[in-house]
Amino acid sequence: MAAKVEPFWIRKTLEHLDQEEWESLCDGCGLCCLQKLEDEDDNSVYYTRIACKLLDLKTCQCTDYPNRRASVPDCIQLTPGQADQFKWLPPTCGYRLVSERNDLPLWHHLVCGDRDAVHHERISQSGRMLSEGSVPEDDWEDYLIFRAG
């Protein structure tokens, strides 16, 4: 009988993933591409419903992923070396889960094989976001959806 092989996200730490494995951890929820506000009093970070100008509001995918940092200089590029800072990511995020040595949820495409499951389970923000160009930045506070961490 063949030994059961654990999935790469269980077997490996983030630092040992190859580029394809790293990119595949993204579940496509779009949450990391929402604009965030920081409370000046306690440094808490809050997610808004306001999406980055490059985010497709339906698919929750970046419309110019390879060049995103040229268009959006403050775009956050996640790397394995930042794992200790992933607490701001949603608790469902594959990067955060693997960095905390947890398994991926059943709806994650690497588990279920369906990239649309994140939308069907309403984990993603598909259909619930606004484009950053449609809301004045001074009004973003009116669109808070949850606190990070």
Curated annotation (Swiss-Prot):
Pfam families: CxxCxxCC (PF03692). InterPro entries: Puta_zinc/iron-chelating_dom, UCP006173. Belongs to the UPF0260 family. HAMAP family: UPF0260. This is UPF0260 protein PFLU_1520. It comes from Pseudomonas fluorescens (strain SBW25).
